[in-house]
Amino acid sequence: MEKNYYVCTGCGLLCDDIEVESEKNIINKVYTACRVGVAHMKKAKGETNFLVNNKPVDEATAVREAASILKNAKNPLIFGLGTSTDETQKLAIELAKKTNATLDDTSSFCLGPLVEALLQDKLKTCTLEDIRNKADVIIFWGADPSDSHPRHLSKHSYFPRGSEKQKGWEEERTAIAIDIRKSHTAKICGNYFFQIPPGGDTEFIDALIAALSGKLPKTSYNFPPKKILELANILKGAKFGVIFAGLGLIYSLEDLEPVFRLMKILNEKANFHLVPMVGHYNMRGFNENLFAETGYVNRVKFEDGMVKHGPEYSVVESLKAKTVDAALIIGSDPLSSLPRSVSKN
């Protein structure tokens, strides 16, 4: 029996304290991991078989066939890489250059805009270690880490004691949830759960900005002004605040302008940071690697040494336009993450 420490790639937390017992390359027991991590690691098997036309082949034949397809393609697409290593991502970028391919990942239809804003220094961010050691006000906005990242609250954001938070969550941390339903995370936040209607995030942000500015907050859905004023007072007192932004927030907004306005006034009144609730364990890595190479986090097209960027180069728009004649999918499953009407193309 072999026992060692491993990094779990079940979500974006990348917990590095996982103990695993394995025998003959089969994982028998997983310790320390959450339910998501245990399921993720136990389903791990040996290397995938190589197939060409649904028939088993050796590795060399598979590589040769894939290379031939890409070489002969007029408009190839490389997609995925959110569950790939940095080294793989950098090689994929070089391959996209060589084949004049469109290159994109799942961030183009989820948290990509937020990550890009962080990399462009338009929003202030921090590390999970900073949050564990310093955070006193934590907001989960359109996010439910109790289900999506089960060790988030216990290991990083709310329950643990940190170097500057020795008294723990009972006395030194305030957790707030803003969401359309009472999630498991919202239940932990207790009275600091602010339930808004679907699509109501922009109005709530405007009302919160008004409250932070000393004005009476108003919403068309009649959210109690007293509760918004109470929230504003908590935020103004934050010494190290953080907003964990999830898909529930991003999908409600037409653009990031309300987020920019909120973060601006929060940092005039207090000290606030924003962290995207990334699901795939290395989506952020792909965004950073592509940004370092091209200045963009996704939706790029390489063409004769030039880089083009725009919504038309997203995986969704490329497939809808039916211009892709070959696709290399790496570490992703477009059939599960894209609408059937798009992925079938």
Set out the residue ranges of the language-model regions.
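A generic secondary-structure signal marking the coil-to-beta-strand transition
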Residues: 174, 239-241, 326
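A short, well-structured juxtamembrane/interface segment
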Residues: 56-71, 223-234, 311-318
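N-terminal export/assembly segments and adjacent metallocofactor-ligating motifs
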Residues: 1-211, 247, 323
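Short catalytic-loop micro-motif centered on adjacent basic/acidic residues
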Residues: 77-80, 243, 328-329
